[in-house]
Amino acid sequence: MDSYIDIKVRVWRQAGPKAQGHFETYDLKHVFQGASFLEMIDILNEQLVAEHKDPITYDHDCREGICGMCSMYVNGHPHGPDSAITTCQLHMRKFKDGETITVEPWRSRAFPVIKDLMVDRGAYDKIMQAGGFVSVNTGGVPDANAIPIPKPVADEAMDAASCIGCGACATACKNGSAMLFVAAKVSQLALLPQGKIEAAARAKAMVAKMDELGFGNCTNTGACAAECPKSVSLANIARLNREFLAAKFKD
């Protein structure tokens, strides 16, 4: 049964992109363990406002593990110490009474801090704009049911499509690589007939944009898949490598 705990929250505070950041520690008492992590931040912000202090700025939207906006490091882990969840799905029952919880923004050169825990993840949007779509005419909605796709292939495409673009893979990687994100977005389309027509151009364009934006190289450490809140498989990176190599041979 959930109870109430007293905690210390050690939060990264940074006034702006060019400002010098620092940690500040706050005491928070009588926190219900059934509360979500973001609800705890909300309670802390109410306390800060009541004390006439600047509330903590952080990104959030759906609070259902879908949008990927609640991007923050919690005790050294992207999205927190629990596995296969986003920060908004993390609950305070994961923490103990008297514990100090350290909260930081994404650690990646490609995701600059805007303020406090909020970062600019626009780099992922630019990669998607480079080729993460189907632009050819694939017919109307009923036509999709006329194209037979084996269930194992459809399942693989669906697993790749579960990527929510949160950025945990790039920030968990010691090289700051976005390969798992790019691989998931390439795979979900390359596996399906509608996406095969532009597969070569897509792989080259998205990898080129990833490199242009300053993401690091993949060295197969597997940290990205270990921290991914949607458990996207490393097999997608292998598929991206095959797609990219095949595309280069077509040049």
Stretches found by the model and what they are:
Residues K53-D54, M69-Y73:
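Long, hydrophobic/aromatic-enriched structural stretches that serve as scaffold segments
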Residues A35-D54, I101-D251:
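Ferredoxin-type iron-sulfur electron-transfer modules in oxidoreductases and energy-metabolism complexes
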Residues T57-M69:
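Short, structured protein-protein interaction patches enriched in aromatics and acidic/basic residues
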Residues E24-S36:
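Short, contiguous acidic and Ser/Thr-rich linear segments
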Residues V74-G98, V103:
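Glycine-rich phosphate/adenylate-binding loop and adjacent beta-alpha elements
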Residues S3-D27:
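Eukaryote-biased recognition of intrinsically disordered, low-complexity regulatory segments
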